[in-house]
Every structure is written in structure tokens, then in C-alpha cells.
């Protein structure tokens, strides 16, 4: 998740960018602890982590990088990170028994609670962690805090107290530590060593991802995580490709056009309900949507931000790349390792290309962050392949990697 979060901050911000670490951490945990409903868990994790991406925190970081407002910035980042982790944990827990009525009820509960918190705390800015004097941002953290509490309560009422409470509480702790201390790394670095032109923001993201991933892995190891069973085959490759394209387009369109401060949360809840009804759609929500966001981000930077070429061909290429990616998602359905490597390396290659097309020149690919992305992805691939080779040498081992062989997850 450390790699996923670092990528999220570079190749796709907002909720769609946050789906990258969500999908990657779910795939990693399902690889370490094999189960049959991998794509369903990955969909709930991708959307659950993605929801927190609707929170604004750029101006909160603006506080932590100044000595006189450091502690207010620290409090704001720690609180927002904790809420991010708690809500994501609760949504993931809902994915362990994704009955349609349960998911529909959970989506409604989250929406109502978010609206209450937004309307009575965030909109009037009663407690505010952004800059009131300079383009004040519409915060949503209180709405998501109430959403997390309401969803845990709802899942407890539905008989899922243990995983919901444990994932939410541990996510709250890991997210709070990760974002609070991660922000401190950036703040203290820029306050005391302003002459060093380092990627302080990226170091913050890596640390946040590490702590968030650790929290989710601990919760996974110490919670009841029932397997909801086989996802089932789709209606045929051609129809599934069309359906995958439709749900991908719908999630983007609803998120961009719904007149709400938490449009992605509303759209994500609707899509998760679709997943609970048509479980074969889960892989496209978890992986195809995530990659499409990455591809569209690169097209935007190529055409608008870096002005390397016209927008039309760039966005057309992004759509074609997403279709090809979706086809491989169908082809490798059921192979957790291949799917994880597909998503991970597609994102890393996209990041390398984005470094290369920067106006300052292709020399950017030797940036230590770019090199770090490649090395971390290579390390993940090497560890998975080393485990397969080691397992094949044991006469009684199964083809699926075991958690015992891998040790406790380091995500």
C-alpha cells in the first residue's frame, strides 16, 4: 500500500486515484490469504479507500509546513487520516458478506450520515482545518466521520460487529498515525531544511500508505473475514466488456455530474450495490475503473498541463488502453498474482511515462521517486515469484501461496 499511495499522489489524485492503493492492498492480502471472492473484496476496498479521497487537505498541509500553525495542521491531518482509515475499514468489512439488501442499507446509512455531518459541521465551518482567508475549501471530514460511525453501527445491527469494529478502529489508528506523522515529516523537513529540495510530499504519502497498509493487514489477521464464495462467471467476454465499460463510464459520470459535495461516495455506494447483485462486475469496479482513472490523468497532463499534444488523441489513447486493460482483467480472472502485477505495473509504467513527458525533459526518469516506484514494484514481483518457486519445491504444497510461508504481510 505504500507503493500504491505514492502512485496515487502522482498519477491520479482525488477519489479515483485513491482507488489504486485500495485495490492493491486488497489484492495483496488476498494473495497472502487466498480466498474465492478476491474481486469482490478488492471492489469494496478500492471504493472504500477512494471515498476518503473526497476530503480536501492541501490547505491543511499548508498549516503544517509553517512553524506558527504546525500543530493545527498536525491535528487536522491526523484527524482526516484517521477518518479516512475508519471509513475505508468499515466499507471493506461490509464486503465480507455483501448481501444486496445489506449493501443497499449501508450505502443509504453512509449517505444520510455524511449529509448530516456536512450540513451541521462542515458547511458552517464550525471546526475548520483549511484557510478561511484564501479560497476556503469545502471540507467533508465530519460527514465522513459520522458515516464511519453509522456504518459500523449498521453492520453491528446486521451481525457483523467484529470485523466492522476492528477494521474501523484499526484503520482509524493507522490512518491517523500515518497522515499525522507523515505530514510532520513534510512539515519539519520544510521548516528546518528549506534549502533541501526534496520530495517531502511524496515521503508523507509513502509513510501514510505504509501505516494504513499495516493497519489493514493487522485487522485482516485478527478478524473474522468470511469468504462469500465464488464470484461466478460473467455473461460472456463481449457482453462483459460492454458491461464493464458501462459501469466504468457510469461511475465517472455520476462522480463528476452529481450535484453533491460527496458525489463519489454516493456513486460508489450505488456501484457497490450493483456489485452485490452482479458479482462478476466486481473486477471491473476494482481494477478497470482504477486503471481508467490513471489513463485519463496521463491524457490530461499530456494535453493540458504539459501541452505535449492535442487532447483528442490523448484521451482516445486512454480509452483504448483502458479497454485493453479490461480485456486482460477478464482473461486473468481468478489469478490474484497476475491481476496484482497487471495493475501495479500498469500504474508504474504510467508514472514513468509521466516523469518522462515533464517539460523539464526525459531526464526526470532518473528522479529517485521514479526509480523508487520501479524498485518497489520489482521487489513485489520478485517476492511473489520467489514464493511460487519455493512452493513448487515442496512436494506437499499447494499451488496457492500461503500466509504462513510468506510471513505476516508487509504492505
Task: Indicate where each model-derived feature is located.
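Long, internal scaffold/assembly segments composed of regular secondary structure
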Residues: 176-269
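Membrane-interface interhelical loops and short amphipathic "cap" helices
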Residues: 3-11, 59-72, 123-136, 187-202
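Cytoplasm-facing juxtamembrane segments at the starts of transmembrane helices
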Residues: 36-48, 95-117, 131-142, 160-178, ...
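Short, intrinsically disordered terminal tails adjacent to the first/last structured region
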Residues: 390-411
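Hydrophobic cores of alpha-helical transmembrane segments in multi-pass inner/ER membrane proteins
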Residues: 19-30, 79-94, 141-154, 206-224, ...
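Transmembrane alpha-helical segments of multi-pass membrane transport proteins and ion-pumping complexes
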Residues: 1-5, 23-27, 49-61, 85-93, ...
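Alpha-helical transmembrane segments of integral membrane proteins
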Residues: 2, 15-20, 39-41, 254-396
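N-terminal signal-anchor module of multipass membrane proteins
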Residues: 1-63, 69-74, 78-91, 97, ...
